[in-house]
Amino acid sequence: MIPGEVITPETDIELNVGRETLKVVVANLGDRPIQVGSHFHFYEANDALQFDREAVKGFRLNIAAGTAIRFEPGQSREVEIVALAGKREVYGFAGRVMGKLD
């Protein structure tokens, strides 16, 4: 083994197995691109993004850690989101929750 080497299985690695997921259509009504990161509480994303905010409270994008999705101006696309896990407490971001989700 080489220091820092990561040995992974030959098979695909599934993300977020067993967690609740939703598909939501998101439109960028703004005049600039908007990028949302993998672990950002989607409910608190930029207000220029139009989608059912109450339906996505407690969810984040279902993409690999450290990646993001970019929404171009005028673009509408369907994305998959996944329920937050752990204590299900949200602090920071846009400051709209600042506590327990459930």
Curated annotation (Swiss-Prot):
EC top class, as a word: hydrolase
One of the Pfam families matching this protein, by short name: Urease_beta
GO cellular component, one term: urease complex
CDD domains recorded: Urease_beta
The protein's Enzyme Commission number: 3.5.1.5
Subcellular location: Cytoplasm
Chief location category: cytoplasm
GO terms assigned for molecular function: urease activity
Catalytic activity reported: urea + 2 H2O + H(+) = hydrogencarbonate + 2 NH4(+)
InterPro entries: Urease_beta-like, Urease_betasu_sf, Urease_subunit
Pathways per UniProt: Nitrogen metabolism; urea degradation; CO(2) and NH(3) from urea (urease route): step 1/1
Swiss-Prot/TrEMBL keywords: Cytoplasm, Hydrolase
PANTHER family assigned to the protein according to its UniProt record, in alphabetical order: UREASE
Cited NCBIfam families: PRK13203.1 (NF009682), urease_beta (TIGR00192)
Subunit structure: Heterotrimer of UreA (gamma), UreB (beta) and UreC (alpha) subunits. Three heterotrimers associate to form the active enzyme.
Protein name: Urease subunit beta
The organism of origin for this protein: Acinetobacter baumannii (strain AYE)
